[in-house]
A protein has these predicted regions:
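Bacterial N-terminal signal peptides that target proteins for export
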Residues: 2-12
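C-terminal motif of bacterial Sec signal peptides marking the signal peptidase cleavage site
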Residues: 20-23
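Bacterial signal peptide processing site
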Residues: 25-27
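N-terminal Sec/ER secretory leader and immediately downstream segment
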Residues: 32-90
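Mature, soluble, non-transmembrane domains
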Residues: 92-197
Length: 197
């Protein structure tokens, strides 16, 4: 009987030590990573992930309570009828640089929480007959796009940030710099517009 207990302990003890050394269990996911500029991601289901980056080194702004302020604003917004509409995922503070990852259930929640009026629509003419370029650099107006080819969406914003989408950018205007087929940089100098599928 003693040998049997010794064998069990001899087996279980190393497994427990191994679990402790390798941090057995769920590791906390890193959302921000090395992102250091404002980034918005539109997921396939229409939800939004924002990485907001701000440098407060040139201001006298006291950032010591900023995380609590953000949590409080989220709690106020969500209340009882919008439970889970906005979630703080990660908060990083290094020197006077603050980076925050926040999830939003929809663009409507993003706009309401942030006081913005970004638009994402299947109505391509929602912004008028805007002049755009295709990915080859050819000029086209929205009215000239053949909507029978694909289910397009149009996104517009007037701020500087990187936009990532679950899809493929097909057309864009002069306030957009293309990073890849699913990522673009909005310059913040005017109303940036992309059409994607």
């Amino acid at each position: 009987m003693f040998k049997f207990k010794k064998k069990i302990i001899g087996f279980i003890l190393p497994v427990l030590v191994l679990c402790l050394l390798t941090a057995c269990g769920k590791k906390k996911e890193k959302y921000i990573g090395d992102i250091n500029e404002n980034t918005i991601t539109i997921n396939e289901d229409g939800s939004i992930r924002e990485i907001a980056c701000e440098n407060f080194s040139d201001t006298n702004f006291d950032i010591s309570g900023l995380k609590d302020d953000i949590k409080s604003d989220i709690d106020k917004y969500c209340g009882s009828d919008k439970k889970g509409a906005v979630k703080l995922l990660e908060y990083k503070e290094e020197d006077k640089n603050v980076r925050v990852a926040i999830d939003y259930k929809s663009l409507d929640d993003y706009n309401a929480f942030n006081g913005t009026s970004y638009m994402n629509s299947q109505d391509l003419l929602a912004f008028g007959d805007v002049a755009l370029r295709d990915m080859a650099g050819n000029d086209i107006y929205v009215s000239g796009i053949d909507t029978s080819v694909a289910a397009y969406k149009i996104f517009s914003a007037d701020a500087a940030f990187t936009l990532n989408i679950s899809g493929e950018i097909v057309y864009y205007n002069g306030h957009v710099n293309i990073n890849s087929s699913n990522s673009a940089r909005f310059d913040g100098l005017g109303n940036a517009v992309i059409i994607y599928k």
